[in-house]
């Protein structure tokens, strides 16, 4: 449906089951042009060591015509918006996603969750907030969407939230999509794949977007060029190899 997927996990996050090579093969099969590997930040119990992220610099940029972005799904750690990505990790990464995960930041009341998420958005360190519609972490959706639009941060619609994880996310995600639409911000679609078989599956995301008449021109996944322009506007250096995507 879209040629870009921005959220997936490899065997480096040990509750996932596919390798980088598996994802490349599946991307070729499905016509995915660009994807981001976003294993969990090191504060999660089964996450890779921070060296894993630093060493992503050895990855090729293109394999058989498929572009690979070096990313992380970092953890929001506290109400100050600190994340478990720092120092040399930033130097090796193209894409920083951050979100709430219970082993790192336990669910709080709506005010506290909102404060932590807005602080993360405003930090300038994050490109995308993952699964902001998680019902375990209620937030002030309009305030989050307005902050994200102001700071040029995308809010994710996460396909896995409607299938395997975060049950009860539908109403919240419709509210997120509508609030982003009204604020003039961006959404990012993520399969949140933990196995390569679901790479590029945005079927449930599309239902959410259609329900609120979300504009296609505010979806980052529409083309590699749109996503790369967004990242470059946030400071990522152009990647010459991606010019052919």
Swiss-Prot record:
Annotated Zn(2+) 2 binding lies at 15, 40, 194
Annotated Zn(2+) 3 binding sites: 73, 101, 131
Keyword Metal-binding among UniProt keywords: yes
Identify the Pfam families for this entry.
PHP
Q: Keyword set for this entry?
A: Hydrolase, Metal-binding, Zinc
Positions with a binding annotation for Zn(2+) 1: 7, 9, 73, 192
Q: Name one GO molecular function term.
A: zinc ion binding
Q: Which GO terms describe its cellular component?
A: cytosol
Q: Which InterPro entries match?
A: Phosphatase_YcdX_put, PHP_dom, PHP_phosphatase, Pol/His_phosphatase_N, Pol/histidinol_Pase-like
Judging by the UniProt lineage, the source's domain of life is Bacteria
Q: Does the keyword Transferase apply?
A: no
Q: Which cofactor does it need?
A: Zn(2+)
EC number(s) per UniProt? Answer: 3.1.3.-
Q: Give the enzyme class.
A: hydrolase
Describe cofactor binding as the record notes it. Answer: Binds 3 Zn(2+) ions per subunit.
Q: How does it assemble?
A: Homotrimer.
Family per similarity comment: Belongs to the PHP family.
Record NCBIfam families: PRK09248.1 (NF006702)
Any idea what this protein is called?
A: Probable phosphatase YcdX
State the organism named in the record. Salmonella typhimurium (strain LT2 / SGSC1412 / ATCC 700720)
Traced from the root, the source organism's taxonomic lineage reads: Bacteria, Pseudomonadati, Pseudomonadota, Gammaproteobacteria, Enterobacterales
